[in-house]
Amino acid sequence: MGIPRTLMLWLLWIALTVPIGLVVLAVVVYGGNRSFLLIGKTTSGHHQIELACDACHTSLFGGREVLHDACVNCHGAELRAANDTHPKSKFTDPRNADRVAILDARNCVTCHQEHRPRITRAMGVTLPDDLCFNCHQEIASERPSHRGLAFTSCASAGCHNFHDNRALYEDFLNKHAGQPAQLESQRVALADFLKSRDNAIRVARPLGPADADAPAAHAGDAAILADWAADAHAGAGINCTGCHTGKAEPERWIAVPGIASCRNCHANEVRTFTEGKHGMRLREDLMATREGPFGLFTASTLAQMTPAEARLPMKRDAAHNSLGCGSCHSAHRYDTTFARAEACAGCHDDPHTKAYFASPHYTLFKREAAGLAPRGTGVSCATCHMPATEVRASDGSRSAYATHNQNDNLRPNEKMVRSVCANCHGLQFALDALADPKLIADNFKGLSSVHVESIEWAQRRLRERSNRRAQGAPQ
Amino acid sequence: MSSNVIKLGTAALLLGTLAAIPVARAQWFGGKDAKAVPVQDVTDMLHAVMAADRAVYTQRVVNRLQNEEKVITADEHFGDKKALPLPAQMFRFGAEKVAESTTKFSYSLLSLWPVNRQNAPRTAMEKEGLKFVAENSGKNFYGEETLGGKKYFTAVYADVAVSPACVSCHNGHPDSPRTDFKLKDVMGGVVIRVPTN
């Protein structure tokens, strides 16, 4: 008497299902090629790290709160720096319970859902763009200037943002009303400060080719030595072993120093690099695979980003470059002039990048690079996308660095007003320019065809309030 | 006779035991509850700390440095203007910090005449409470309300103009709906909520 057919089928089902289930579970927990787990196209902000699932899904059993905490883990500092206009604490207050019932703004994922390509709009927003209406229905009665405006127009360029309104609040608009398009002084922020800092780290006697301390087996050729000797590193007393050896194993020669070597001295630059799209795969806590049982899974990090994987137009011959510090800063010739514009154009192939080389900004950049104009008057890609950032320590001391997170002030683009545009241009000119997609594509060659009215509205309201107050009427 | 006495005695003992059960339960198993501070005392204590800190900041920092010594101003946009945060902002920042660390209570500073419209009363109890403390000098308002399906003990305390800085700022602010405040006037109220279920 053989085994009944039904039992046979059950055993077969179990024999197939259990191992397959264990494999899937192991991949979910430890890593490997997880692309089959993706439930929908990932947003442009996260697609590079989509296979490091536990960057966001920090717990297998987590819900909205877990995802929210993951968002805050990476974006919290940025929101705090932006004086987030809608912090979570505003919505955990019981007095707003009725609002939360309509739109639960306590969690990031209410507005920013991942893997939902069909409903994902700019900046990863997955709600319809009339979301402001849920809480601000009275705006037309409070602000007559807003009567008749479409509910989808609140976040139009130059008006309001949900999180960052540092360049758009009423007093700011009023303070900068009436500014000329071209300010009298047109220099990037902190230009002098950065120059003084650069000089401060120069040593009394810069190193030369004869000082190179690389072991004979690794001595570079004359061209490498010449590059290094003419470079800021030699000027600051950084010898070959400064980058090619590590503290843990000082005897071991590191043939190609990576981001860890750079981090030893350029911590802020490396940190911000890993916060932006160029280097986010290199964040220290991101893992493609974690150590698994029985040696089945070996810990590995994500591979460096390549232009081929980008969602913006890139040059075909740069498709397989990998993005690390050395991509823009060559190893021994730390040429910041090259890194600030030509390095970008080495990969990026979109209209905005291509138009830069025919723009007034590039003309200024060339003049500065040629020594024909003062430091800080040229405008490179990095001037706008990697601006100098000032840091104040708790003791009041100042320091500055060039942020290497090129996304920090990119969207919504009004974020660029304070950190970049306002150094050279009046607020109205800047808001109008940033509101014109065609002008942006032309890299600001020409004038904006869009006019943002927010400054005029703020001015009108200021006058009306002053008049009413002068007449003794209630506001 | 003796049988009846025994029956009565037994019944009395039984009743006494039944009556003692809740007391004993509270004593042995619910000691924490029995000794719990009444929620009204809790909100009163919280408010005492809030009101003291608020008065100290307003009088000894803002009024002294801005109005008396004129060495620095207090401004809504204190970051941009390198100024002191307004007393109301200091209070709100504290409330936001508390909200980040606990849900056991929450508080806010509201007014029937708010400079920022977001700080006008929203719930029926906020409206009733603010009106009560404005019209009944020295008295607090207590009540219970249900918000988002949760019950809250809600206390409202008068927020009084403790220094000339309060009066001059509110009377002079372009967004202030009232411009005739005087020192010691009730300008609004502190609303403290404690969830009760």
PLM feature spans:
Chain B
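Bacterial N-terminal signal peptides that target proteins for export
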Residues: M1-A12
